[in-house]
Amino acid sequence: MKIMKLAAIAMAAVLPVTSAVAAFPEKPVNYVIPFGPGGESDITARHQQSFFKDKFGQDLVISYKPGGGGAVGWSQLNRMRGDGYNIMGINLPHIIIKPQQKAVGFQTDDITGIYMFHYTPDAIVVKNDSPFKTLQDLVDHAKKNPKKTTMSGSGKGTANHLAQVRFDKMAGIKTTYVAYKGTGKAVAALLGSQVNAEWGYTSVGAKHSDKVRMLAVAMDKRHPKFPDVPTFKELGYDLVSGAYRGIAVPKSTPAETRAKLSEMIKEINADPAFRAKMENDGMALLDIDAAGYNAFINEMTEVYMNAAREGGIIK
């Protein structure tokens, strides 16, 4: 009898939680982007916004907490209320590399990810009139002219920079990476002929298709928007990389709520209209849910840390 009473009490305690999670969301969800408006983190959140409303009946309210390349926002994530109504965008390699460079107010393990939903693949980009018609052309030039092949990119320790370090090692070349503050300035340097090429993203190819060409994209398979552009893997280089984006919640968020949010983002990702919108912008969909998040981060940490040490980004 005593056991039955205890079981009844336990069941009663579980039911309200389960019921609340089943009804979630019952009000707007606050989606914090740890960067300013207009960047890809903002653009992809805006893409999610309308689908969230249509599927779940509540608004996804986007706000911004820029600073420190995302660090200001991530350092405050766990101070937010963990009720499922506060979520924050996360980026790789940022959340892995930044804490290794200096004190930024958070460690990678402080981030509780519930879904990695896409990445913008790295790509080597050249102007339409570039003498480099293929990736091999660029590699041959770099081998004959060590450190004289200049390539712009978005900052040190970014996805672009780590891709440059990794590819140089794979190809047996030494190029010179010229870091700019943001993709926009790196593209401007390319278009202004200040560099020979750019370590950019597939989104650059989508946005500036009338002015640039991509020699290769860092994907497992060719991007559907760019069927004529080969992957690095096709050309003999095992390089799949880019700027990965996902969503995290405060650590205090209950496991049931994390799982529910994870399923919601998965549902948006599966929508053909959402996929088409993302791919048209040059992005690639990814489906790493809450259950697979830690394993994914561990795998990427090893890749990024090796490249960061190789490139002198961290000691």
Regions found by a protein language model. Name each.
Residues F52, Q76-N86, P99-K181, K185, ...:
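Hinge/capping helix and adjacent helix->loop/strand transition within the periplasmic-binding protein
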Residues A8-P16:
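Bacterial N-terminal signal peptides
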Residues E26-P28, K169-T175, A255-K315:
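An extracytoplasmic/periplasmic, membrane-proximal ligand-sensing/linker region
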Residues V17-A22:
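Sec/Tat signal peptide C-region and signal peptidase I cleavage site
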Residues A23-D110, K148, K156, K169-W199, ...:
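N-terminal (or domain-start) structured segment
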Residues G38, L92-P93, K127-F132, G153-T158, ...:
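Short coil/turn segments
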Residues Y119, S203-A270, E299-E302:
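C-terminal lobe and pocket-closing loops
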Residues M1-A8:
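Bacterial N-terminal signal peptides that target proteins for export
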